[in-house]
């Protein structure tokens, strides 16, 4: 941090240096940990999420170090991608050292290439594991098929209960957030998916569904691979489920609603349990506060383009820790990456 001047406001600059695993190496067109510039873009794991945030803060401080208009504190984390498990305890211990008037989290991004963007909301998150344990041993499908519901049948029915034929989430008791958002067009979201052929649900508003409403995804299923498949009825199966929450939804309430839905939709008297795991609140950042307005003005002058305000369908788990610990600080969510070609967490991140 810089030497403190009591006459100046204090800005805390946050980013994280840790990254996601590489994933399928065969889908990368460059070496993931060897930075490479192709057509003006930097490719490599962490190039956007979030080493770009670290470099952004470094360059800002370097450019202004001779005449800093504010006090600067820099906080670079190394556990964000595993949910920042030590963040709350760390903030408790170092609250006085990290106190600031403005907290700039450079872990978001831009809606389009060339459009400077401020993030005004983040969805919350709860997740957990559905566990099916039928009281039986594995039996040849020729001996038991059609007589008892095996674990895969049970799990499939529960998973199918989460959405209706229109793709609408069927978990009761969750309330969408109500706020004005930038309206995404169908072509925008197809660019993010990298396909013009992907079919979207019929929606009144893509942006509201993506940023302000709950959304459930099945992240993984424990099952034998098709290469190892044999004619057996399986007694045990698991599925990891992730429920994105509206920015203003209470995560404890949402976890309860998720579990209740699962328990109410157990078919055929099967033995099913739910193991809650991660839980985090969403965030709403007011774009009309002083620092954000100054930032947007400078964005537009430098980029020679109107700034955009967007929500983010994902979560930044630690952000709520900052909000709770520093309730009077202005929270600003920005980033160097973009939604069009960024590929955060995926192959060919740039």
Model-derived features: positions:
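A generic structural motif
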Residues: 48, 136, 243-250, 280
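Active-site metal-coordination/substrate-binding segment of hydrolases
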Residues: 8-73, 342-345
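Short beta-strand-to-loop junctions in surface cap/lid or active-site-entrance loops
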Residues: 1-7
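A short core secondary-structure module
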Residues: 89, 145-167
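Acidic/histidine-rich catalytic neighborhood of metal-dependent amide-processing enzymes
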Residues: 46-121
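An extended, acidic, His-containing surface patch that forms the Zn2+-binding/catalytic region
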Residues: 20, 112-113, 169-228, 232-236, ...
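Acidic, glycine-rich active-site loops and adjacent beta-strand->loop/helix elements
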Residues: 17-19, 41, 75-84, 106-111, ...
């Amino acid at each position: 941090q810089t030497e403190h001047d009591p006459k100046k406001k204090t800005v805390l600059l946050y980013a994280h240096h840790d990254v996601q695993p590489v994933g399928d190496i065969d889908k990368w067109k460059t070496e993931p940990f060897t930075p490479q510039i192709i057509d003006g873009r930097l490719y490599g794991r962490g190039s956007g999420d979030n080493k770009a945030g670290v470099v952004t803060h470094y360059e800002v401080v370097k450019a202004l170090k001779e005449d800093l208009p504010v006090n600067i504190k820099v906080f670079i984390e190394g556990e964000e991608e595993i949910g920042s498990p030590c963040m709350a305890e760390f903030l408790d211990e170092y609250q006085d050292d990290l106190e600031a008037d403005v907290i700039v989290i450079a872990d978001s991004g831009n809606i389009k290439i060339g459009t400077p963007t401020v993030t005004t909301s983040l969805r919350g998150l709860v997740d957990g594991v559905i566990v099916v344990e039928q009281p039986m041993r594995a039996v040849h499908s020729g001996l038991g098929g059609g007589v008892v519901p095996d674990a895969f049948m049970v799990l499939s029915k529960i998973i199918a209960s989460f959405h209706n034929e229109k793709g609408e989430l069927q978990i009761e008791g969750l309330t969408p957030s109500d706020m004005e958002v930038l309206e995404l067009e169908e072509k925008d979201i197809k660019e993010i998916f990298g396909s013009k052929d992907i079919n979207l649900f019929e929606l009144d508003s893509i942006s509201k569904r993506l940023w302000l409403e709950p959304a459930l995804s099945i992240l993984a299923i424990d099952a034998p691979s098709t290469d190892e498949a044999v004619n057996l009825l399986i007694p045990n199966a698991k599925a990891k489920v992730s429920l994105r929450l509206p920015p203003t939804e209470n995560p404890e309430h949402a976890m309860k609603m998720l579990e209740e839905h699962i328990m109410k939709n157990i078919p055929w008297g099967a033995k099913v349990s739910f193991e809650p795991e991660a839980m985090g609140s969403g965030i709403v950042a007011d774009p009309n506060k002083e620092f954000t307005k100054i930032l947007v003005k400078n964005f537009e002058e430098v980029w020679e383009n109107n700034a955009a305000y967007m929500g983010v369908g994902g979560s930044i788990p630690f952000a709520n820790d900052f909000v709770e610990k520093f309730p009077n600080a202005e929270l600003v969510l920005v980033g160097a990456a973009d939604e069009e070609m960024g590929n955060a967490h995926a192959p060919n991140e740039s």
